[in-house]
Amino acid sequence: MRRRLGAAALEMDAASDGSGHTRWRATVAARLPSQRWPERTVLIVAVDAHSGEPVVFDRHSGVDLVDAVAASCANGPPYGIGDNRYIDGGYRRSSENADLAAGYGRVLVLSPLGGRSRAPLEWGMHLAAQVDELRARGSRVETILPDSNSRDAFGSNLMDLSTRPPAARAGYNQGRALAEQLTEFWR
């Protein structure tokens, strides 16, 4: 599946004039609060459009944070870093990629899309399967899915910028409502 998606993205790339890359990078850079990698461990997932293999970027990858995020969110034509082309990291396994937290004692999974997946259940790519795997390996896992107010505010078009303020407010309110529960989780 990832290889087919990558091939389709590469076809779009071949038909484009290349200007989308510069615009996409500028868009991503403008939306990040900082263009420097955090000191804490942050893993950003993309999929190599040529091979279909997942790639995980971190501060030691030699890739700018803006480029890693742009590659991870590339939907349509792939995003180029050097000679490589990448597509959305959600195609790796799921938009959460929670399985990358294997080995940690406590894992907090934020699932803004509510754990939805288009993959068949038997593929084991759904969020529930990843959470089960983490727990089987000894992790304590808490998963936060959007509540109904957050889902309504977020809407169905992930790229609609008009939903950002109401979605942020709804997410903030949900976070405040969950604060005590999450405090207990981290104790």
Predicted features, each with a name:
Residues 1-187:
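Patatin-like phospholipase
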